[in-house]
């Protein structure tokens, strides 16, 4: 679990977020993060497999999701991106953005079907008040 989080943490270390971006630019930033994280396809697939394997073990499952060591830094990064895009209640929306990115990442890791992450993220960000 820690090794998976360490890899994700390395993906976001030293990431610079401009002070102000459009919602489309924010989506592009998030897509860049998603694409960078997706390069570790084996780690993402292993995490997905563990999630299914541990679905009945709340404590261990949470270490891969809500309580993962990287979750707080990812949520903080999402909040910074949302703030830069001028989105109200950024801190309230940040966990949802992290969840959406995680879902897109898992979908890609599973090779479920083609999905246009940029379109999905732009639509999500445009829909926020």
Residue ranges and their predicted role:
Residues 45, 52-53, 76, 88-110, ...:
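Hydrophobic alpha-helical segments that form the core
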Residues 2-44, 94-97:
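Hydrophobic alpha-helical connector segments
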């Amino acid at each position: 679990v820690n090794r998976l989080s360490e890899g994700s943490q390395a993906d976001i270390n030293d990431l610079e977020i401009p002070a102000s971006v459009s919602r489309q630019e924010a989506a592009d930033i998030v897509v860049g993060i998603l694409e960078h994280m997706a390069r570790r396809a084996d780690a993402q697939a292993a995490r997905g497999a563990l999630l299914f394997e541990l679905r009945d073990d709340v404590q261990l499952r949470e270490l891969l999701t809500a309580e993962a060591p990287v979750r707080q830094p990812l949520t903080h990064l999402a909040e910074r991106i949302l703030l830069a895009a001028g989105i109200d209640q950024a801190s309230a929306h940040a966990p949802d953005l992290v969840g959406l990115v995680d879902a897109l990442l898992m979908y890609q890791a599973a090779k479920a079907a083609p999905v246009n992450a940029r379109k999905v993220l732009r639509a999500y960000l445009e829909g926020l008040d």
